Amino acid sequence: MKKKSEFEAPYIGIETIDNTPIFYNRRGDYSVIIKCENPIIQYSADMDAYYDFHHLFTNILKVLGTGYTIQKQDILCKKSFLPPQNRKNDYLSNRYFEHFKGRIYTDISTYLVITGEVERSKFFSFDPRRFDTFIRNITKVLGLFANRGIRAKLLNENEIEIYIKRFLSINFNQQTVSLKNIKAREENLIIGEKNVQCISLVDIDEVNFPSIIKPYKEVNIGLRFPVDLLSFLHDTPSIDTIIYNQVINIPDQRNEANKLEGKKKKHKGMPDPANDLCVEDIERVQSDIAREGQMLVYAHYNIILAGLDDISKAINYVETSLFDCGIIINKQCFNQLELFECALPGNAINLNSYD
């Protein structure tokens, strides 16, 4: 019988400094969690709103700069509707809420996790000036949300602890939360009674990702109607919870530009159709950097699906829907526990290069 091992959460503590609740992972990197609203209504049909929200996060990346990792986590979970406690106590209000009480709906929450990386080149790696800059940058990010009229707040110590526990147990739709056993398999995880699978959207060994992606797509309903690129997640069958995890790491821009130039010369030295295509892509990226001030980043995207029953139907639905968007998922996701652990808030820095 295989020996069971204890799963250790990759955190060492939480503290509040200058009214900023900060938690630390095992490497010593420090993170905050911002809960923000998504200002775009599902059927708003407003293309400008999608671009505005996209530009907001572009500005956040530029404000933070080198040495940061950003995780945007969208939690979609099924909940049973309960009337609000502060509702009006009149006949029409009571009848209205009684009519909808108990109905299942999809609740959406958005969290932004910002992690400051500790330099590894020194024996004593903590730099108080970098830490002070991190706290100032968090204030700037909150200011960017406020300027756009978007509600955003820092989670306090208790809320951070509860959010991490909910993530570990994939439990976002019950008032009480408890940690469950995790059984790791090649193709999925079993957390308590739930079947969980992590789908990585990018395969670095194959060119299965569109070169240009808009923040929305258009569906044909007799007219061109813009919807969110992953709006199909709302209709995923046999699913209790979906976590869409997006990770962006901002490296040193000068070093990455030098690496890109070296890679271009390497491809130019071996002329064939595949290498010529790589050279064209690199030159296009260099042009965008020079003209529009774009940044070079490392990115990772994955979708975590969880359900009490068999989720193979949901996996097939998501895979087919992504294919319609021009995205072919990574077929080599056999490191399910590793992908799940790296999706935890503040732990994306541990992602391997092949993810």
Please place each PLM-identified region on the residue numbering:
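Extended, folded cores of ATP/NTP-driven motor/assembly subunits in large transport
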Residues: 1-355
